[in-house]
Amino acid sequence: MSRIGRQPIAVPNGVTVNAQNGVFTAKGPKGELSVPYNTALNITQENGQLLVTRPSDRQEHRALHGLTRTLVANAVKGVSDGYTINLELRGVGYRARLVGKNLELTIGYSHPVVIEPPAGVTFAVPEPTRIDVMGIDKQLVGQVAANVRKVRKPDAYHGKGVRFVGEQIALKAGKAGATGGKGKK
């Protein structure tokens, strides 16, 4: 049996869940989220916990078991706590600011880059060099954060650009002659 699939999912207070006709719905203080799932699997609620069970050990059921449990757990956590991904800007003059709901990045191009958030995602800029991407859908928050990072990926030689907080960038050495020593004459 799937190690992930057999783990129960705790349902926090204030979150209501419903699973029928192949759609799992979770409602909580942060909003409402629906996740489609394969109807061959069963999602049951017992003692404030959700259990995802599969009808057999067939390959397709085993493949869907852990996936479905994780998607359901992400939906429950999203509507109760939400998800946040933090990005940081490194580079001289690199900064971000909010213009209404949109994120405006000044990151070394001849023009500012404006990113409009999709429905369900919000931006926050606590510092000019830090961006928080927030929402209830884990997949959507991660995709938007990756799109923001893609605007100016970290440079391989200096590390300048947009990166996730805590991300380690493997820097290249650069030219061998740029060590500052005396060159040939």
Curated annotation (Swiss-Prot):
Keywords, sorted A to Z: Ribonucleoprotein, Ribosomal protein, RNA-binding, rRNA-binding
GO cellular component, one term: cytosolic large ribosomal subunit
Any one GO molecular-function label of the UniProt entry: rRNA binding
InterPro entries: Ribosomal_uL6-like, Ribosomal_uL6-like_a/b-dom_sf, Ribosomal_uL6_a/b-dom, Ribosomal_uL6_bac-type
Matches recorded under Pfam families: Ribosomal_L6
GO biological process entries: cytoplasmic translation
Binding partners and assembly: Part of the 50S ribosomal subunit.
Family from the record: Belongs to the universal ribosomal protein uL6 family.
PANTHER family: 60S/50S RIBOSOMAL PROTEIN L6/L9 (PTHR11655), LARGE RIBOSOMAL SUBUNIT PROTEIN UL6M (PTHR11655:SF14)
Role of this protein: This protein binds to the 23S rRNA, and is important in its secondary structure. It is located near the subunit interface in the base of the L7/L12 stalk, and near the tRNA binding site of the peptidyltransferase center.
UniProt cross-references to NCBIfam families, sorted A to Z: L6_bact
Protein name per the record: Large ribosomal subunit protein uL6
The species this protein was found in: Deinococcus geothermalis (strain DSM 11300 / CIP 105573 / AG-3a)
